[in-house]
Design a protein with these regions (language model features):
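Non-catalytic, topology-defining segments of multipass membrane proteins
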Residues: 1-170
Length: 170
């Protein structure tokens, strides 16, 4: 059976998956949350772009959308205008439909215009990361399957589920 370019023991696949998801969590926490949304941390261009690229591959997240929605959440916290308020919408909806709430608010041009200032607006952001946000996820699937064989599909599925599940506070 084809095992991919990298053949690991079962625990190697587990550790690899945990390492990949850890990079994603770090990218969300350091880059999106601290650096982009709150401007509490300055990053050099190299780690900043690494995180943008990694998030494109592992989540399809558009930086301006994420930062805008998070900033609006803080500006309108626990009001009817909060894009993902558990007080207004209910904890069950926020936990189970958080990604859908994100996608809905990302379609609001007023949110992006008002709260998206200072986010990357270069050629690669406009022409690749934003325009083809789902392409990164497809490339990650191909990479996982080529490197790890059929188990790569499971690794990819865990990567795709990681942020929607863990970003809800679990």
């Amino acid at each position: 059976m084809y095992s991919g370019l990298i053949d690991l023991p079962w625990w190697g696949y587990v550790l690899t998956t945990l390492a990949l998801t850890h990079i994603t969590i770090a990218a969300v926490t350091i880059f999106l949350h601290r650096h982009q949304a709150h401007r509490a941390l300055e990053l050099h261009a190299i780690p900043s772009h690494f995180f943008r690229f990694w998030l494109w591959l592992s989540t399809g997240t558009v930086t301006k959308e994420w930062a805008s929605i998070h900033r609006k959440h803080h500006a309108k916290c626990e009001t009817a205008e909060d894009p993902h308020s558990p007080v207004i919408l209910g904890i069950k909806k926020v936990l189970l439909e958080g990604a859908e709430l994100y996608r809905k608010e990302a379609k609001n041009p007023e949110t992006l215009e008002k709260y998206g200032r200072g986010t990357p607006d270069d050629w690669i952001e406009r022409n690749l990361y934003t325009r083809h946000s789902l392409l990164g996820i497809a490339i990650m699937l191909a990479i996982d399957v080529v490197l790890f064989g059929p188990i790569g599909l499971t690794i990819w599925a865990v990567q795709m589920a990681w942020i929607p599940i863990n970003a809800a506070g679990i």
